[in-house]
């Protein structure tokens, strides 16, 4: 595709097998209403999940089921001295730090809006786009960029082999990478463009992109080769030792 060269490097998958249609990051979402009422400062670190004041108010996505949960755990693991191929520090420290604060491990983020509205959830892993979507529905959420960095998250597309409309599929895939398509996705869906030439069509959309560029300065990229190889083992261990 001619637009390939215009994509962020992180949106260009190995060997051109796929391309990111939007980019984002997993950081910290929090209950703005609760924080305001209790006069708590906004979160600044992944280690805020271990703050005793959040006991029974942390909601964490399940590592085996959710990329957000995986991202949050791996950042905690890095802070404890681990790497993406060595999660011993994370598993060893979880039960004495974040674990006691967790109200519920959820399989997806679908329950978060209800749990925020009900005053159950104070703090949770989430993306800026996810937070913006909930805010647009009147849910009192805000996003905080952890000082240790957020984790890069890319939604990618590829055309499947031997489909019955290969030319149309390629045209659609190429269109979704254009500045035109991504400007619309940004304006109407808060989707952060992967095409660097996308021009935001409204001041609000421009503000979203400006915030994203700030977040990208400290974003972390996982070693997905190691993660994909080891994740089945982590899933089993998580289910046996964390989420029982």
Regions found by a protein language model. Give the residues of each.
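Mature extracytoplasmic/periplasmic domains
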Residues: 160-219
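Extracytoplasmic/secreted proteins, especially bacterial periplasmic and envelope-associated proteins
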Residues: 44-45, 71, 75, 86-89, ...
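A ligand-binding cleft/hinge motif common to bilobed small-molecule-binding domains
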Residues: 117, 123-140
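Conserved C-terminal helix/tail region of periplasmic/extracytoplasmic solute-binding proteins
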Residues: 215-244
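Extracytoplasmic ligand-binding site segments that recognize negatively charged/polar headgroups
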Residues: 1-117
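Ligand-binding "clamshell"
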Residues: 10-15, 133-145
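Periplasmic-binding protein-like
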Residues: 92-98, 105-106, 137-161
